[in-house]
Amino acid sequence: MARVTVQAAVEKVGNRFKLILVAVHRARLLQSGRENSLVPEENDKVTVIALREIEQGLITESILKENNQHEDQIQKKVQMKTISSTQDFD
């Protein structure tokens, strides 16, 4: 069973509430398969993997914000292409 020192992860992020938000976001990315784990999985659940990545300093709030911005840009491009392709049919 994996042991995660939550206190070390809290120190990396700043406070426990921010840790929860960052860990949940990262766990969802891992669960959806959009990103791969940065640490050995060792049959751990995605929440444990996310906490271990944060504890080791591999994932930070700023990295996730950059990822969100990139995903938003991709989504906007897809929406624009969809809009332009539907306008071609009109």
UniProtKB/Swiss-Prot annotation:
Enzyme class (EC, first level): transferase
Keyword Transport: no
Keywords in alphabetical order: DNA-directed RNA polymerase, Nucleotidyltransferase, Transcription, Transferase
UniProt xrefs under Gene3D superfamilies: 3.90.940.10
A biological process from GO: DNA-templated transcription
Catalysed conversion reaction: RNA(n) + a ribonucleoside 5'-triphosphate = RNA(n+1) + diphosphate
GO cellular component terms listed in the entry, alphabetical order: DNA-directed RNA polymerase complex
One MF term in the entry's GO annotations: DNA-directed RNA polymerase activity
Record-linked InterPro entries: DNA-dir_RNA_pol_omega (IPR003716), Pol_omega/Rpo6/RPB6 (IPR006110), RPB6/omega-like_sf (IPR036161)
Domain of life: Bacteria
Record EC number: 2.7.7.6
Annotated function: Promotes RNA polymerase assembly. Latches the N- and C-terminal regions of the beta' subunit thereby facilitating its interaction with the beta and alpha subunits.
PANTHER family for this protein: DNA-DIRECTED RNA POLYMERASE SUBUNIT OMEGA
Assembly and oligomerization: The RNAP catalytic core consists of 2 alpha, 1 beta, 1 beta' and 1 omega subunit. When a sigma factor is associated with the core the holoenzyme is formed, which can initiate transcription.
Family under the similarity heading: Belongs to the RNA polymerase subunit omega family.
Protein name: DNA-directed RNA polymerase subunit omega
Organism listed in the record: Hamiltonella defensa subsp. Acyrthosiphon pisum (strain 5AT)
Encoding gene per record: rpoZ
